[in-house]
Amino acid sequence: MDDGVAALRRGDASAARRVFESALAEVESGEAFEGLAEALYLEREYAAAADHYERAYAAYRRERQHMAAGRAARTVSWITGNVFGDWAVRIGWLARARAILTEAGEDSPEHGWVLIIRAFLEPDAQAREAFLREAIAIGRRFGDPDIEFYALSYLGGVLVMTDRVEEGLVLTDEALAAACAGELAEVATVDSIFCGFFWTCELVNDVPRADQWMRAAAELMQRRNVVAAFCRAHYGGILTAAGRWDEAEVQLLESTRHFDRGMPERRAASLIRLADLRVRQGRLEESAMLLDGLDDHPDAVRTLAALYLARGEAALAQDLLERCTAGSDDGVPTVGESTMVGPLLALLVDVYLEADNVDAAERIAQRLARIAEAQRGPYLKAAAALAKGQVCVARGQGDARSCLHSALESFALAQLPMELAQTRLEMARALAASSPQVAIAAAKAALEDFERLKAARHADVAAALLRSLGAPVRTGPKGHGALTKRETEVLQLVGVGLSNPEIGDRLFITRKTVEHHVGNVLAKLGLRNRAEAVAYVTREKTSR
């Protein structure tokens, strides 16, 4: 048993599985069932894991190990609710866990885990926060860092959702620091903390924070096999926002495969994000196929509205966004409004302007400005400045240039290249009459950004604007300049003779991601193999 537990703690699920299966072949016990269940969970075999936790529960009850039975019951509750979405089953198993712990009459760390699950079920934000703070206190009292930092990470997410963004992100940072320092015993706890962190960063478009922690935690994530399907989906969303679309596609497709293998009913998380990527790329038919059947999914609202707008179906986008952002245009922002509604309002401004409803666009832009002021994050600040600038351009009055400059600065700070390029395009429109040379420069910069991102539809719009300004538009192969920043890094490492695994170690990316980048580099540069890539890099260095 000790060998199996040690294997679990170092993340070696296959070794642990062999140990516990061997133990169960000799005698069935709660400890062996629970150990095998944890190994199955780490291998993403969620249905089998839940089944073996149930068996562990029954065995512990027979053995009259009350605290262990309560632990098994709350874990079944966790898996059935969070993985399979079976809320009634989750409630039943959680009630069983609470009853057993009450029956045992002991003060133990298990009460902390139960409080965490209760927080997931609690709709009221204040009550949820209270449960989590109590769980943190229990973890500290018993010296159980898994409880303490899991609850701390989740509390950070709750604070972000209630617009206490900076306070919440500091808590998630602390939980990640503990995970990276090796303070946590359970691989599943580390997994969940990373998933919560990626979800939080995606929610507020905090690309720099996600990027820093990915570098800091690269070794841990590889060693302990941390990135599960939900993590990959959220990380793919962050990579999409960061303009690293090739990497995003790899993560999202891998996430879909993970979901298909372990929990196909929850694959909407990756499908919605992949659909968002396709809209940005201008691959609208593929996006529509990915969103088929997800019309009522709350996470699909923004992507679906963006798809409608891109297809010229502004009325459908308007109806959807108005329903999902219903509220006062004049009142004080409600709790959680900036985090959840802000991005939808930014898109609604585009929809109203497309319909030439400038008055409605201005009302929404003003509402967006109020909630951006409440959150004070760079993304919403930039989105509000862009919306105000767009309204100024549409009205032909106001200081559009100043607003758009502010948006450019904030989008650059947030490391959001797609939004940065769109703002440059708006700047070109704003200055077309008064400063045509500056407008041409802005449009050219936008076109280059869109081409680098491979955002075909937006690149066409930028090219058309340049032509209308009387500027020549370059066509044909772009050579080395068409490579993304990451592809250029990969090319340089190929050029010095590194293998794919060596490149992956150097850049903290997976071997599959390296293969994807190498294939793109060869295709873009018209090269047939790595030897030609080495020769290409050598020629480039010689010509400088």
Which stretches of residues belong to each language-model region?
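Alpha-helical segment of the N-proximal tetratricopeptide repeat
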Residues: 1-25, 35, 117
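Amphipathic alpha-helical segments of tetratricopeptide repeats
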Residues: 17, 24-25, 54-65, 78, ...
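Residues within the DNA-recognition helix of helix-turn-helix
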Residues: 52, 442, 517-520
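Residue signature of alpha-solenoid helical repeat architecture, marking inter-repeat boundaries
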Residues: 27, 34, 63, 67, ...
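Single-residue signature of alpha-solenoid repeat helices
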Residues: 16, 49, 89-90, 128, ...
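Helix-turn-helix DNA-binding segment
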Residues: 415, 464-467, 473-544
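Tandem amphipathic alpha-helical repeat scaffolds
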Residues: 5-9, 34-44, 70-86, 110-125, ...
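Generic long, charged, amphipathic alpha-helical segments
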Residues: 360-426, 469-480
